[in-house]
A protein has these predicted regions:
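Conserved N-terminal glycine/acidic-rich loop preference
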Residues: 25, 33-36, 42-44, 66-73, ...
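N-terminal membrane-targeting/anchoring modules of bacterial envelope and secretion proteins
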Residues: 12, 29-32, 44, 50-52, ...
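Structural beta-alpha unit
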Residues: 1-10, 23, 60-63, 79-112, ...
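General small-molecule cofactor/ligand-binding pocket signal
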Residues: 43-45, 90-94, 143, 185-187, ...
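Short beta-strand elements of ligand-binding domains
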Residues: 113-116, 142-147, 287-291
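Short, structured interface segments
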Residues: 130-149
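Small/aliphatic-rich secondary-structure junction motif
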Residues: 2-59, 155-204, 225-228, 232-233, ...
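Glycine-rich, Arg-bearing micro-motifs that act as flexible, cationic patches
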Residues: 114-133, 154, 242, 256-282, ...
């Protein structure tokens, strides 16, 4: 753990993908709550993919697509303003395909929000296609809205950490918790098979390795408390053989599950690992994925 001076990261504007599906509408209203909580603007984005469609679609159809998209954005903005009349809401109709459009709208400081299911077809925000593409490739935080509207708040944000390198994005999770006036729970899963594999039986000090993990997680919690002295921060190391299973279970006891996204192998291709992949499909609460390339002020000395 380094001794750099840490500062609180700022939470940026909220950018939500709108495609007309019930899931996207739920995500838009969730994003409005998030933007209001942050004191930031909300951007409603529909990426109509008209540049690509124009290769095989006539101009009249393209115009109809644009008009339908404008109506969709206006209707969504109206629904948001009914609940948050003072929230600054901007509508954007983009010509790109959804993954590129959402990334462009987010810039380098925004947070992208998507629903957990889409309509299918060109404009869908379906996990497995667009939603997964955004979560895997975006260089800004991405929140996949999961869980039911009727679910009561727990007053906690959970961060799933691995090691000391997670500090930068962990401070963003702390900022999320503070904005919600919630506690931050730092959880690390100690899976001996995943960490030392088939040589586990040959190691004499597995308990010592586990204690080292506990020490690292405690050190992370201490650094967070330095930056957020008023924040309630708990930390826990869970032992088990299924990291996704443990975190999915934990998602039922928290309002937001936050995790980092590793660097891409050789610098190319998507980098969404199996744990994140499982969580955004099966979590019982919204999941926030923060890429390692997202440099917060907290990571600068």
């Amino acid at each position: 753990m380094t001794s750099e001076i840490l500062t609180r990261p700022d939470l940026g504007d909220v950018i939500v993908g709108v495609d007309g599906s019930p899931s996207a509408r739920t995500a838009a209203l969730w994003a409005a709550v998030e933007a209001d909580r942050r004191g930031r603007s909300l951007w409603l984005v529909h990426a109509a993919d008209t540049d690509r469609r124009a290769y095989w679609t006539d101009a009249e159809t393209i115009q109809a697509v644009r008009e339908a998209a404008r109506d969709l954005l206006v209707g969504t903005a109206t629904a948001v303003h009914e609940r948050f009349p003072d929230l600054v809401v901007t509508r954007r109709l983009l010509r790109q395909e959804p993954v590129a459009g959402l990334q462009e709208a987010a810039g380098d400081r925004g947070t992208i929000v998507v629903g957990s299911r889409g309509l299918g077809g060109f404009s869908a925000l379906m996990l497995g296609s667009v939603g997964l593409g955004v979560a895997a490739r975006a260089e800004v935080p991405v929140i996949v809205v999961r869980g039911g509207d009727e679910r009561p708040e727990t007053g906690s944000v959970t961060a799933a950490v691995h090691d000391a390198a997670d500090l930068d994005w962990l401070l963003l999770a702390a900022a999320e918790a503070e904005a919600r006036k919630a506690a931050l729970r730092i959880v690390s899963v100690w899976n001996v098979l995943a960490h030392v594999g088939s040589v586990a039986s040959m190691l004499d000090d597995l308990d010592g390795i586990a204690r080292q993990r506990v020490h690292e997680v405690k050190a992370l919690a201490d650094r967070v408390r330095e930056v957020h002295p008023g924040l309630i921060v708990g930390h826990h190391v869970e032992t088990g053989t299924s990291t996704p299973g443990i975190l999915i279970e934990a998602s039922g006891r928290t309002d937001l599950l936050v995790m980092g996204r590793g660097r891409r192998p050789l610098g190319v291709g998507p980098s969404l690992g199996r744990v994140a992949h499982a969580l955004i499909h099966h979590s019982r609460c919204p999941v926030e994925v923060i890429p390692s390339a997202f440099v917060t002020e907290a990571g600068q000395s």
